């Protein structure tokens, strides 16, 4: 695989997790998960670019720890950076304790990132 392919694979799963774990806030209860009404094509181009930059930088920093587990890394990066109660450190994950700690710390350093529906109908961070 190429670096670009690896980045896109990780990004695809990062976006999938973001849509699955984010709500549309359409009502007082939080509404529906975004993935029920939105998909990757609904991301604003700047949002996709920002997500790709985050995934690419993370992958470059932890390529040896991630290995071929790009799908899991994308998923865990979104969950961990946003404090969803699961992520790199969670039991049953394929990472060593040391790698999980390093990746968790790096994900937290990125800060939280929330998707929202803009006035243009597209998803933004």
What are these regions (language model features)?
Residues 1-68:
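Long, contiguous N-terminal structural blocks used for assembly/anchoring
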């Amino acid at each position: 695989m190429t670096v670009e392919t690896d980045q896109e694979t990780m990004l695809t799963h990062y976006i999938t997790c973001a849509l699955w774990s984010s709500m549309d806030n359409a009502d007082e209860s939080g509404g529906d998960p975004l993935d029920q009404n939105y998909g990757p094509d609904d991301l604003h181009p700047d949002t996709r670019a920002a997500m790709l930059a985050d995934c690419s930088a993370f992958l470059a920093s932890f390529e040896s720890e991630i290995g071929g587990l790009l799908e899991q890394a994308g998923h865990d990066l979104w969950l961990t950076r946003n404090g969803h109660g699961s992520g790199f450190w969670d039991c049953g994950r394929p990472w060593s304790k040391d790698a999980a700690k390093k990746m968790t710390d790096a994900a937290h350093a990125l800060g939280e990132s929330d998707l929202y529906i803009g006035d243009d109908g597209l998803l933004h961070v």
